[in-house]
């Protein structure tokens, strides 16, 4: 994946404005989510996001050394020190709801539970850390041999989260938010994913795909 929407924020606002102008005509209620690496966040953009975005995804991979290894700036310096204060401000401005910090763990940080707990220590209450999807030839790619370590890490993370909740230090970890009476994961677990039911990817050239994972694979172009 790639692309930072705040690099062309005028288009973001144009999309929202256009959708709002046609939703009543088509009996729709559009909900917008924006994903950002935070480099270009400022007070004006935060205010717009809080007024127009149903959800916000803030890209942060956890500990400073982990984040800066995978998310360097154009000049090679790390991004952690620049983005964390902005993310904290935005999360607090949304009352710690309707957002999540989204990290990616790789072969480099199979001890990702430490990254989850680090983000919790930063004050974030909505946290998601997902496994990387990468070419197997990449040095940071996850291999089958890594799975026992990953499974153990999830178990240790569950223990840590339970301990913190008993101490009154709660936070939500997306993969553990399972409520069979209507939790956020239950529908996806039943149907596999939102492709074909609630999901559509639109490219900059206007091509349609059932999911962003398929973009560029012409056999899936709709």
Regions found by a protein language model. Give the residues of each.
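Charge-dense, low-complexity intrinsically disordered segments
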Residues: 6, 73-77, 141-148
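Cysteine-cluster motifs in flexible loop/terminal segments that predominantly coordinate metals
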Residues: 222
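Radical SAM/AdoMet-radical enzyme domain recognition
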Residues: 8-134
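A C-terminal junction/extension of Radical SAM enzymes
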Residues: 138-218
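Active-site groove signature of glycoside hydrolases
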Residues: 1-5
